[in-house]
Structures are given as C-alpha cells and as structure tokens.
C-alpha cells in the first residue's frame, strides 16, 4: 500500500479555501485517479494548515495515476483554493490497524 500525502505549510499571508478543497479539489483528484476517497486534515495548530492522504494499492498504481492525463487538471486546480506551494510525500504503509 502506498500513501501519497500532500501537506500545505502554514505561511504568513497565504490563503487556503478549505471548503473548495474538500468539496471540489479532493473529489477531482479522487475521480481522476480512480480512488474511492481520501483523508483530509484541517490544521488546528502546528506547521500545516491542511493535508490530504490518498491511498494506492501499489507503487505502480500510484505511478500510473501521476502519469494519467487528468493529473495536469488536478495540478492546474491548485490556484483555485490556495496560494501555498504544497509539500508532498510518497510512503509505503508498513502497518495499519
């Protein structure tokens, strides 16, 4: 299992529209990549204002999703909800309850 996390660092003067992110952007990403859903975090206190975690069954599935033509549309949608440059992490899930 591969987890793809996108984190948005708290940045002075930056904007982030949580409603648009939850209602439009993340569903667009899920539909594009053929996923049933994702976990969305809204930062309360700490270094990130928001994060999302997508799960893929394998590294190959993740790589195929990133290479899909619709991924460009997902990336192009970012300015519609934030001025923050996100940080990403790709991780292998080694344990899950």
Where would I find each of the regions flagged by the language model?
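Macromolecular interaction modules
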Residues: 1-97
